[in-house]
């Protein structure tokens, strides 16, 4: 008897309970369990103890305070819940029990499971990838709002937009944001906004609520419609702690509707500052361009002064005329471009700034244009005057000018220039060049 017992693996009670606990924890892993709460207690330790049961069985459960503080409701006896748990054994008493890691009301639990499944599916398809998200426009021309016409979210968005950018156009696409038909209506509103293409950013959202209240923003049709939108979309659903599938798919997630309005609006004071910066940049660009043209003209004038032959002078004169014309055309084009830019800026200011400021800035631009045109005209007159002086100097040394003073040039009929009487003999015919024509003569003697 003693020898047979020695060959057996004999457990102590504590060892048996320990190995059973390890077996349960390692082999079973995480389980999801639905049941009714009974015998709920919450002692001063902060841990929760309860029993989960159905019509045929029950099991003891423990939920330690590190996990139960994340539960957003107070469990009640008789309440149906969905729990995420692991199996274990309380070794001192040998009690089989469930260690709870999370707990939700049973209805919320089903929705949460659907949420996680759809989230995993869409993530696998790449709908949450940052690479497919579109940037928000820096200065939206029109903002679309997809929400309930009677909800607090619309009031909050419009209030922020009126305060920050009162002249920003807004288009409201009213839709249900709660209930069975809400998801389809939201998707249709997004599609309608893309078809009409009147806005360059959309805010899709509503105020806070329960998981069921916000569930329309977790529908697959809403997620795929947001992903397919050509217009950037900001999701603004509930409060900062509320997270929906729409938040993951949208190009930008705002924690609240008011925050979404902040994202799409710029303070009108910033726009006035940007206008002043454009004006300063325009003036600096014009001064720099004129300085470059003056330097180039000075170089050309220096070359012209150093080259006196008539043909070269004529070429330089032609180049000067062409450069003057190009300069004038360039200045006119530049002024026209700047005028167009100014007109666009003025149009924006008419929407966002006092009218008298726009008129004053336009008056200043007209004066500046007049001063520039006057400077160009004076510059061209001076250039033509200098060219006339150079032409007079050239005429002073021209052979034609010498003929005009009464001198003549004599050549033989072969075109040889006659400088000495020894070059001719009696009977030769000579051609004498005068200012206004030629004379043929015959040599009688020399």
UniProtKB/Swiss-Prot annotation:
Record localization: Cytoplasm
Signal peptide region: none
EC annotation from Swiss-Prot or TrEMBL: 3.1.11.6
InterPro entries: Exonuc_VII_L (IPR003753), Exonuc_VII_lsu_C (IPR020579), OB-fold_nuc-bd_dom (IPR025824)
GO CC terms of this entry: cytoplasm; exodeoxyribonuclease VII complex
Record GO biological process: DNA catabolic process
Alphabetical keyword list: Cytoplasm, Exonuclease, Hydrolase, Nuclease
Keyword Zinc: no
Location, primary (coarse class): cytoplasm
Molecular function terms from GO: exodeoxyribonuclease VII activity; nucleic acid binding
Catalytic activity: Exonucleolytic cleavage in either 5'- to 3'- or 3'- to 5'-direction to yield nucleoside 5'-phosphates
Reported function: Bidirectionally degrades single-stranded DNA into large acid-insoluble oligonucleotides, which are then degraded further into small acid-soluble oligonucleotides.
Subunit structure: Heterooligomer composed of large and small subunits.
Family to which the UniProt record says this protein belongs: Belongs to the XseA family.
HAMAP family tied to this protein: Exonuc_7_L (MF_00378)
Protein name, entry field: Exodeoxyribonuclease 7 large subunit
Source organism per UniProt: Vibrio cholerae serotype O1 (strain ATCC 39315 / El Tor Inaba N16961)
């Amino acid at each position: 008897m003693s020898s047979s017992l020695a060959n057996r693996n004999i457990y102590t009670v504590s060892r048996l309970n320990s190995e059973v606990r390890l077996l349960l924890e390692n082999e079973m892993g995480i389980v999801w369990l639905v049941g009714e709460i009974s015998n709920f207690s919450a002692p001063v330790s902060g841990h929760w103890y309860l029993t989960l049961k159905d019509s045929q069985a029950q099991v003891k459960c423990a939920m330690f305070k590190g996990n139960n503080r994340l539960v957003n409701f107070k469990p009640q006896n008789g309440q149906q819940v969905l729990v995420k748990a692991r199996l274990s054994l309380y070794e001192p008493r040998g009690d089989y029990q469930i260690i709870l890691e999370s707990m939700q009301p049973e209805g919320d639990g089903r929705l949460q499971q659907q949420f996680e499944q759809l989230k995993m599916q869409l993530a696998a398809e790449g709908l949450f990838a940052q690479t497919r998200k579109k940037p928000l426009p820096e200065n939206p021309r029109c903002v679309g709002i997809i929400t309930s016409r009677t909800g607090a979210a619309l009031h909050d968005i419009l209030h922020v937009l009126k305060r920050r950018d009162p002249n920003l156009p807004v288009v409201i696409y009213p839709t249900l944001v709660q209930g069975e038909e809400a998801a389809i209506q939201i998707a249709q509103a997004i599609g309608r906004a893309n078809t009409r293409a009147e806005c360059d950013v959309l805010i899709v959202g509503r105020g806070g609520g329960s998981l069921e209240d916000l569930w329309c923003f977790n529908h697959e049709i809403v997620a795929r419609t947001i992903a397919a939108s050509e217009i950037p979309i900001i999701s603004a659903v509930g409060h900062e702690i509320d997270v929906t599938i729409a938040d993951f798919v949208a190009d930008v997630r705002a924690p609240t509707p008011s925050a979404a309005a902040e994202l799409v609006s710029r303070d009108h004071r910033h726009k006035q500052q940007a206008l002043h910066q454009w004006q300063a940049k325009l003036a600096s660009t014009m001064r720099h361009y004129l300085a470059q043209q003056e330097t180039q003209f000075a170089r050309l004038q220096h070359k012209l002064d150093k080259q006196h032959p008539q043909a070269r002078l004529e070429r330089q004169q032609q180049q000067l005329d062409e450069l003057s014309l190009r300069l004038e055309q360039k200045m006119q084009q530049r002024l026209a471009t700047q005028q167009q830019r100014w007109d666009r800026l003025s149009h924006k200011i008419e929407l966002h700034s006092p009218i008298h400021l726009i008129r004053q800035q336009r008056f200043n631009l007209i004066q500046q244009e007049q001063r520039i045109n006057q400077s160009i005209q004076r510059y061209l007159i001076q250039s033509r005057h200098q060219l006339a002086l150079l032409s007079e100097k050239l005429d002073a040394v021209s052979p034609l000018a010498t003929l005009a003073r009464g001198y003549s040039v004599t050549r033989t009929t072969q075109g040889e220039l006659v400088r000495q009487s020894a070059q001719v003999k009696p009977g030769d015919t000579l051609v004498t060049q005068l200012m206004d024509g030629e004379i043929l003569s015959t040599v009688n003697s020399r």
